[in-house]
Swiss-Prot record:
Record's compositionally biased regions (Basic and acidic residues): 39-50, 84-98, 684-693
Domain topic, free-text comment: The Q motif is unique to and characteristic of the DEAD box family of RNA helicases and controls ATP binding and hydrolysis.
Gene: rok1
Residue ranges of domain Helicase ATP-binding in the record: 223-434
Record function comment: ATP-dependent RNA helicase involved in 40S ribosomal subunit biogenesis. Required for the processing and cleavage of 35S pre-rRNA at sites A0, A1, and A2, leading to mature 18S rRNA.
Protein name in UniProt: ATP-dependent RNA helicase rok1
Annotated organism of origin: Aspergillus oryzae (strain ATCC 42149 / RIB 40)
Length: 725
């Protein structure tokens, strides 16, 4: 008998921390939204927040300044006086001008903070354009004419390492959102709106991009010149605050323009997003920021007029005169004109999908593309999709329609291949060559973390299910977890389930809709969302999912990009993604803004084995970035055994998905394969009986419809025609 147990039998001990108390994305906002940080960088940032300036060349004096705070053996009176003096100093410095604050952080400090947060800023221009800028910034003594030839040679003889070093930039990072007002002089009302939204600590992408877009002087040609807004390519993890990063500079720029030129009004910025859901989300976030600033942000809708055409009036009048009779008066003609032509949108920022704006500018492709001469900023959110073959022509048409000579472009995504970067560079260069401006605008690229990698704050699980029935069984085990080992992953609602095609999403939804008991809400807790639904249905499902009325949402890649569900606990890839980039975006729906505890489960079958390696590599890199200890989700033997995919197969997979799950298969062999991948637990006999029943009902309905029509020829004139008088 255990004596301790006997003596403490009346005492209730608290059990260890249960899984319910574990940190989950749905439990609330993370204390620190930053993904990458260390103690040294946090110490430097804290010094900047508290106003403690580190003077150059005075490192020896620094311990003496900190002595009062470290003197633990002094008397109470003396120490209190010294502490008060130390606390009063920052308040005096905070009252100083912004020009003094610019000298606070030297290049070593900037480099330390940026490197610790894994922020890499690169100048994407040619070396011939970069080196003259660097030469002007340096104050050098007079040189002889003989050495001028030697200046041109290093541009060709530089090694790759030296070229990378020449391109690296270390701008001043944003310490806190308060600096937007004190350091960069943004609109007072805009700064208040940011504070009201609860933004205090900037994420990595905000820490790096906001100073660049708001006029950072630390990397310019000289501090006396006006800062130049660059063109920007940004690759940052999902959920890191990219929307806020591009909205704040655009709104501030428009506010300044309105103060300077009140009479000029029109569309000054265009934000392009690949889906309606993402465009609507950007507008909702933008409306919170523009409140009280006088800036208007609008979502592009069907039939909306964005430009005024001279030939539109003539067309409407011609239509009205041809349709109306001679007796109609002029009032009806004017009514037709007002009905036929919508008023031009009075908005400063237009958020749109590519096709909607192209149709508006080209009158549904019946007229030449109109121009947007006032647009000074074009933002491509999820730029890798917008410049993919599916949207490329539409996006480039919008880009070309923005004809203002000082147009600045910024491209944002969590994944951006080298081909997309090259296309962006070539487009910007074409515009520069076509314009008559001699002024050169820099092109920078900012990368946070490892490029094209998944966020490190979520747990990945790659599960082999062998067959379609195995995947369905594994998914039901997630919905109804039984007693399991501590190492097993538990996924709690709300979560998303991704499928390859719309028919598969519908089939999976119909299979799972009764898996949640009626006591918990039943079938109303599971919904399906895809592009075949109407706009009203899609917005209603999104609203209910955000409100928490829907717990499980089955969808396609429609929701894989940009949508911010902050309380999502996990993602289930029921069908493997078409590429590693799609995987990064899918799993990025959880773990938003630094939230811990998100789970990403990916099921794969025998048919998926040739395509899994790219996903396994992304998971492996993410776990290395996280620095997890213990058992990994992807073992080394699995990485070594999975086959590599050829470029042709990768292209085919990206375009059509796994062949066995395609809906347009017609051959006998493909039909057999499709039967294997059917999402259903019904046996073949049950399906045959259901089909027979459906066929009998359809035949009976047809006989009823054909009965009266078939009797007419027989009855004809032989029937009784009534009493004739």
């Amino acid at each position: 008998m255990d004596a301790f147990k006997l003596l403490t039998r009346s005492t209730k001990f608290k059990t260890g921390p249960s899984s319910s108390s574990a940190s989950l994305p749905s439990t609330g906002k993370a204390e620190n939204p930053q993904l990458f940080r260390n103690s040294e960088a946090e110490k430097l940032l804290e010094e900047q927040k508290n106003g403690k300036k580190r003077k150059r060349g005075s490192a020896a004096d620094e311990p003496e300044e900190r002595e009062p705070n470290l003197d633990f053996f002094s008397s109470n009176k003396g120490s209190s006086k010294k502490v008060v003096k130390a606390e009063e100093a920052p308040s005096d410095e905070e009252r100083g001008s912004g020009s003094e604050d610019e000298d606070e952080m030297d290049e070593v400090q900037r480099r330390t903070i940026l490197n610790s947060h894994k922020i890499k800023v690169t100048d994407m221009r040619e070396l011939e354009e970069i080196q003259p800028v660097q030469a002007q910034g340096e104050e050098e003594p007079k040189k002889k004419k003989k050495k001028r030839k030697q200046k041109e040679e290093p541009a060709q003889t530089l090694t790759k390492k030296e070229q990378k070093k020449a391109r690296r930039l270390f701008p001043r990072p944003l310490v806190s959102f308060k600096e937007l007002r004190t350091q960069y002089k943004i609109s007072r009302r805009l700064a208040e709106n940011i504070t009201e939204q609860g933004f205090t600590v900037p994420t990595e992408v905000q820490l790096g991009t906001l100073p660049l877009l708001l006029g950072d002087r630390t990397i310019g040609q000289s501090k006396t010149e006006e800062p130049v807004e660059p063109d920007l390519l940004v690759v940052a993890p999902t959920g890191s605050g990219k929307t806020l990063s591009f909205l704040i500079p655009v709104i501030n720029k428009i506010v300044r323009h309105h103060h300077g030129q009140q009479e000029e009004r029109g569309i000054f910025a265009v934000v392009v997003a690949p889906t309606k859901e993402l465009a609507s989300q950007i507008v909702n976030e933008g409306r919170k920021l523009v409140s009280g600033t006088g800036v208007k942000i609008t979502l592009m809708k069907k039939g909306m007029q964005v430009v005024e055409r001279e030939d539109d009036d003539e067309d409407v009048l011609d239509e009205g005169s041809s349709e109306s009779s001679e007796s109609e008066d002029d009032e009806k003609t004017t009514e037709k004109k007002s009905k036929g032509k919508a008023p031009v949108t009075k908005s400063d920022i237009l958020v749109t999908t590519p096709l909607q704006l192209v149709n508006a500018l080209s009158a549904n492709k019946t007229k030449p593309m109109a121009t947007l001469p006032l647009v000074r900023n074009i933002v491509l959110d999820e730029a890798d999709v917008l410049l993919d073959p599916l949207f490329r022509e539409q996006t480039l048409d919008i880009w070309r329609a923005c004809t203002h000579p000082e147009l600045r472009a910024s491209l944002w995504s969590a994944t951006m291949g080298s081909s997309i970067e090259d296309l962006a560079k070539s487009t910007i260069k074409e515009r520069k060559d076509a314009s008559s401006l001699t002024k050169s605008y820099p092109l920078y690229r900012l990368v946070v973390g490892l490029k094209d990698s998944a966020i490190p704050n979520i747990q990945h699980k790659l599960v082999y299910a062998a067959t379609e029935q195995g995947k369905l069984l594994g998914l039901r085990q997630l919905l109804h977890p039984a007693a399991a080992a501590a190492s097993d992953i538990r996924l709690r609602p709300p979560f998303l389930i991704f499928t390859q095609t719309i028919p598969r999403a519908v089939a999976l939804h119909s299979e799972l809709r009764y898996d949640i008991p009626p006591e918990a809400g039943g079938s109303s807790r599971i919904a399906v969302l895809h592009s075949d639904l109407s706009d009203g249905q899609r917005s209603e499902i999104m609203k209910n999912f955000r409100k928490g009325e829907i717990w499980i949402l089955v969808t396609t890649d429609l929701l894989a990009r940009g949508i911010d569900f902050r309380g999502i606990n996990g993602v289930v890839n029921y069908d493997i993604p078409n590429s590693a980039a799609v995987y990064v975006h899918r799993v990025g729906r959880t773990g938003r803004a630094g939230r811990e505890g998100g789970v990403a489960v990916t099921y794969y079958t025998k048919e998926d084995i040739p395509y899994v390696k790219s996903i396994a590599n992304v998971i492996d890199v993410s776990e290395k970035l996280r620095g997890t200890e213990g058992e990994k989700s992807v073992q080394k033997w699995l990485l070594d055994s999975l086959p590599d995919l050829s470029k042709k197969d990768k292209k085919e997979l990206k375009k059509h998905g796994v062949r066995a799950r395609q809906t347009n298969l017609k051959s006998v062999a493909d039909d057999k394969q499709q039967r294997k991948t059917r999402i259903s637990t019904k046996s073949g006999f049950e399906r045959r009986m259901e089909n027979k029943k459906k066929g009998a009902i359809a035949a009976s309905r047809n006989r009823k419809l054909q009965g009266p029509s078939g009797a007419e020829p027989d009855s004809g004139d032989d029937g009784w025609g009534g009493i004739q008088e």
